[in-house]
Swiss-Prot record:
HAMAP family: MepA. Residues 228-274 are annotated as: Disordered. This is Penicillin-insensitive murein endopeptidase. Its cofactor is Zn(2+). Pfam families: Peptidase_M74 (PF03411). Keywords: Disulfide bond, Hydrolase, Metal-binding, Metalloprotease, Periplasm, Protease, Signal, Zinc. Murein endopeptidase that cleaves the D-alanyl-meso-2,6-diamino-pimelyl amide bond that connects peptidoglycan strands. Likely plays a role in the removal of murein from the sacculus and could also play a role in the integration of nascent murein strands into the sacculus.
Length: 274
């Protein structure tokens, strides 16, 4: 097979992988009382709220992607956190992806963010508000060294520590995903007040942002919560295991076929997508 044919096949495969999912055809929230349905990586939402684009405390990035929808609890969390940050004079909170109008699967970039309870927040707090052009094409600030073993000391700021801690202390937050090197730095900086560290979980990538996840709302009866994180601050052997080389013979897990949708989410698709 010649190179042109190989390139064409690669392009077609790439295009297929980025093909729009049915959820992207739903352009407005589904009317009804707010209900997060299913799990974070296989679910949907009825009655999502739209995060107001204009705020003196935060700015929303990539608004052209229209990923600023979520459960009312998520919208209130963002407003609550950004107000705290502003009152402390720390800067402007930069909001990344939340979810789509009815939640559901993205065509790439996220496995979760499906039930309106997840949000990505940049780990930088500009003192000067970003321009429209900067918000549409945001420049992420990679806080982790090339070898992945520690944060870049010249980029790590006390304000970023405080931002993550404030988010983790929020009553509605159940998990915050950050790079292992960032978790390690939080462990070093935390001092004796360490209870909140339990919620901060090391995960792949997440070098420039934190992924905040809320607990299932009490009245979302079909929402599936994760088990609570292990007890303790998570700064011991589990964290160190992230820095160890992979064991010989370790291979990447095969990509799994997505599980069936929860019945309520399938019914929502059947009703709202032609």
């Amino acid at each position: 097979m010649n190179k042109t044919a190989i390139a064409l096949l690669a392009l077609l495969a790439s295009s297929a992988s980025l093909a729009a999912t049915p959820w992207q055809k739903i352009t407005q929230p589904v009317p009804g009382s707010a209900q997060s349905i299913g799990s974070f990586s296989n679910g949907c939402i009825v009655g999502a709220d739209t995060l107001p684009i204009q705020s003196e405390h935060y700015q929303v990035m990539r608004t052209d992607q229209r990923r600023y929808f979520g459960h009312p609890d998520l919208v209130m969390f963002i407003q609550r956190l950004s107000s705290q940050v502003s009152n402390l004079g720390m800067g402007t909170v930069l909001i990344g992806d939340m979810g789509m109008p009815a939640g559901g699967r993205f065509n790439g970039g996220h496995a979760s963010h499906q039930t309106g309870l997840d949000v990505d927040i940049f780990l930088q707090l500009p003192k000067t508000r970003w321009t429209s052009a900067q918000l549409l094409r945001p420049q992420a600030l990679d806080l982790v060294s090339r070898d992945g073993k520690h944060v870049v000391s010249t980029l790590w700021k006390p304000e970023i520590f405080s931002l993550i801690k404030l988010a983790a202390q929020d009553k509605d937050v159940t998990r915050i995903f950050v790079n292992p090197a960032i978790k390690q730095q939080l462990c070093l900086d935390a001092g004796t007040d360490r209870d909140w560290l339990r919620k901060v979980r090391p995960w792949f990538q997440h070098r420039a942002h934190m992924h905040v996840r809320l607990r299932c709302p009490a009245d979302s009866l079909e929402c599936e919560d994760q088990p609570l994180p292990p007890s303790g601050d998570g700064c011991g052997a589990e964290l160190q295991s992230w820095f160890e080389p992979p064991k010989p013979g370790t291979t990447k897990p095969e990509k799994k076929t997505p599980p069936p949708l929860p019945p309520s989410c399938q019914a929502l698709l059947d009703e709202h997508v032609i």
